[in-house]
Amino acid sequence: MLDAFDRYPLTFGPTPIEKLERLTDHLGGKVQLYAKREDCNSGLAFGGNKLRKLEYIIPDAIASGADTLVSIGGVQSNHTRMVAAVAAKIGFKCRLVQEAWVPHEDAVYDRVGNIMLSRIMGADVRLVDDGFDIGIRRSWEEAIEEVKAAGGKPYAIPAGASVHKYGGLGYVGFAEEVRAQEAALGFAFDYIVVCTVTGSSHAGMAVGFAKDGRADHVIGIDASFTPDQTRAQVLEIAQRTADLVKLGREMRPEDIVLVEDYAYPVYGVPSEETKDAIRLVGRLEGMITDPVYEGKSMQGMIDLVKKGYFPEGSKVLYAHLGGAPALNGYGYAFRNG
C-alpha cells in the first residue's frame, strides 16, 4: 500500500510484539494481551510513534529545499521531541512552539522530560500560554512566518504530524507490519488498542486494517477530552489517507471506534485510575507508560477487559506508542511510586 511513497528510515525496523503474560493472568486469562513496542522503535531520543509518521514526511521536507522544521505541541510534547531529534539527524534547524496544553503545576514541568531533551538537541523552543486544541494553531503559523522573516526556509509539521498530507501513512505501514508478524505468529489479532488524540496513528491503522476488514477492530481510547473533535479529525485523516494509498473504498464514520470513558479529568492530567494502571503494568510487566497518553489507553484496555468488552478468547494487541520521558514532568504525582 505504501510502495509509491518515499520513506526516510528513522527506525530500527519492525517493532517487536510481546505477550503480556502477567497482565493477562492478572485479569483472569480469558483475553490474551499483547503489546507492540513502538516505544522501542529507534535510537533517536527514546523513539516513539511519531517517527513512523516522520519517515514519510521528511522526504518531502528535504525535497522542498527547507532548512528548518517548525512544529508545535504541549510543554511535554513527545512529538516535538521527535521533530527536534529528526532535525538534528538530518542537519536541519528546529523551531518548536510549546503551548500550555495541560493545567499542571509541577514545579519543574517546563524544565525536564521532553522539553529538556528538545533543548539538548538544539531546538529553538518557545513557550506560549495558549491552551489545548488539536487543530491548526495561530502560534505555529506565527513561528513559520518568523523563520521566513529571519531568512530561514521553514517546513511546517502540525501537532502530532497528524493533519499533514502524509501524516497517516506511517500507521498504514504499522498495519502491514502487523499482518506480516501475524503470519509468523500463526494467528491474527482480534482487536488493536491505541491511544487517540490528534488522530493520525488511529487513522492510519484504520486504513491499513481496512484492507482485511478490521478497521472497526482498531479501538481508539480517547485521551483528548474533546472526543467529538478528535473523532472527526480521525475520520478526515483516514479518508484522505485511504485516497492516497488507493484503498479502493471510502472510510466511513462506523470505521472509527473511539471509547470516550478514560480521558478525564482533562487532557494531560492523569486520574487516580490512570495512575493505578501505570503502576500495575509497571509492576507486572516492567513496561512504562506515561500519564498523558499510554497510561490512559492502558487504563482503558484493562477496564474493557474487566467489563467483558472483548469476547472470551480474544487476542488483543496494545499499541505502545511511547512517551515515557513525560513522566519526569509528573514527579510529584509519582513521588512514592
Swiss-Prot record:
Signal sequence region: none
Residues at the catalytic site: S77
GO biological process, one term: amine catabolic process
Protein biosynthesis in keyword set: no
CDD domains linked: ACCD
Reactions the enzyme catalyzes: 1-aminocyclopropane-1-carboxylate + H2O = 2-oxobutanoate + NH4(+)
Keywords tagged on the record: Hydrolase, Pyridoxal phosphate
InterPro entries, alphabetized: ACCD_DCysDesulf, ACP_carboxylate_deaminase, ACP_carboxylate_deaminase_bac, TrpB-like_PALP, TrpB-like_PALP_sf
EC number(s) stated in the UniProt entry for this protein: 3.5.99.7
Residues with N6-(pyridoxal phosphate)lysine modification: K50
The UniProt record lists the keyword Cell membrane: no
First-tier enzyme category under EC: hydrolase
Cofactor: pyridoxal 5'-phosphate
Assembly: Homotrimer.
Family, per entry: Belongs to the ACC deaminase/D-cysteine desulfhydrase family.
Cited function: Catalyzes a cyclopropane ring-opening reaction, the irreversible conversion of 1-aminocyclopropane-1-carboxylate (ACC) to ammonia and alpha-ketobutyrate. Allows growth on ACC as a nitrogen source.
PANTHER family per UniProt: 1-AMINOCYCLOPROPANE-1-CARBOXYLATE DEAMINASE-RELATED (PTHR43780:SF2)
Protein's name according to its UniProt entry: 1-aminocyclopropane-1-carboxylate deaminase
Species this chain originates from: Allorhizobium ampelinum (strain ATCC BAA-846 / DSM 112012 / S4)
